[in-house]
Amino acid sequence: MASKGKVTQVIGAVVDVQFEDGLPAILNALETTNNGKRLVLEVAQHLGENTVRTIAMDATEGLVRGAAVSDTGGPITVPVGNATLGRILNVIGEPVDERGDVSKAEARAIHQPAPDFAAQSTESQILVTGIKVIDLLAPYSKGGKIGLFGGAGVGKTVLIMELINNIAKVHSGFSVFAGVGERTREGNDLYHEMIESGVINLEKLEESKVALVYGQMNEPPGARARVALTGLTLAEQFRDQSGTDVLFFVDNIFRFTQAGSEVSALLGRIPSAVGYQPTLATDMGALQERITSTKAGSITSVQAIYVPADDLTDPAPATSFAHLDATTVLSRAISELGIYPAVDPLDSTSRILDPQVVGEEHYQVARDVQGMLQRYKSLQDIIAILGMDELSEEDKLTVARARKIQRFLSQPFDVAKVFTGSDGVQVPLEDTIKSFKAVVAGEYDHLPEAAFYMVGGIDDVIAKAQRLAAAA
């Protein structure tokens, strides 16, 4: 028999509920009705005198003292599995895309312990994305966590969509996208772009490759603080049921921290540095430790990270850095050159760019490419002031090769076909290593720079050079 209680106090997103008997456990979901709609409350504190303090997962306008509340007996539970593919859910697992109900045949609680040590897979393996600049210079590891840094309009969303597309094609895996405190318009745009690019199939939803979970900026802090966990729960189910590699996107992980800080203040906890919640590291750890590889499969997470006031020492981004295995930095300067994806080859890093994981050849080629690009960067001031003619012959050669490498790091994407007019390509890792090794060694010095722009492997470069020569 579910315990019954009544609302005794409403302060914004915080609701106090008093029970006659049978106090619900911390993190239990309570249900009440507000304006005829189901409202879920999550227990956060026990106050004594049979009263619990809860966080509301939706707006509390209209909720009154004395309203009846029932305990569900467990944490918030959401539908999971194939029924969620191609759908948009909210924090409590209700569909918000106006396409009917989602089957609750498979359901999971959003609060789960991290897999224990015995279940985790510890070997480092590269997750091949088919995107040259990432695979070569800042490779992603299976079950790793990747931070995606970039301002507005440099291509974060396009890169995220291409990764979803490639994981579906190359690894036939699923993706889960959690929109945490993002703009509703961006969420809507992403949904429609996914339909256009075929990642979501409206005719046959079960053939879609992605499930979406949204808690936008206008939602109360309770929803924004929990929506990342809802998305992660969906990803865990895909990993465990299919044993494949699952991609889990969070946009934006900073909003998760921000919502936690709002909730913390409402609960009356004393804030720590810069006004953040005292439990900042615990909250982040509880989310990040669940993102891991098990012997069944892996969850690889790509997290967009907003850096407040570009201050990397701010506690919110600084806490997330500790968990990251790789960083992909998108640069406005590179996007202005028309080079997409606009990944900065010198700023992006990866823990697994190590000869013992990726192999000696891959490591050496990556370091040679970065060395050449770094030399070009240091020569740019001289070129700007004195011109190319003042450089030594050796430096002229370095600059010529570096410019070819810079263009060769660009690549047409499937999801950006409408902008580029050319079909996207996924480049196998072996081809990427072989191609860049040859370019660094000077085997293609005779080919024009333009032949290296927006192509796949080196064979495409040669074919493009022949087309350019014929056209000339």
Curated annotation (Swiss-Prot):
Q: Which residues are noted in the entry as ATP-binding?
A: G150, G151, A152, G153, V154, G155, K156, T157
Which PROSITE patterns does the UniProt entry name for this protein? ATPASE_ALPHA_BETA (PS00152)
Give the enzyme class.
Answer: translocase
- Which keywords label this protein? ATP synthesis, ATP-binding, CF(1), Hydrogen ion transport, Ion transport, Membrane, Nucleotide-binding, Translocase, Transport
**Which SMART domains does the entry mention?**
AAA
Q: What is its EC number?
A: 7.1.2.2
- One of the record's GO molecular function terms: ATP binding
Under HAMAP family, the record lists: ATP_synth_beta_bact (MF_01347)
The protein's assembly and partners: F-type ATPases have 2 components, CF(1) - the catalytic core - and CF(0) - the membrane proton channel. CF(1) has five subunits: alpha(3), beta(3), gamma(1), delta(1), epsilon(1). CF(0) has four main subunits: a, b, b' and c.
**How is this protein named in the record?**
ATP synthase subunit beta
In the UniProt record, what gene is named as encoding this protein?
Answer: atpD
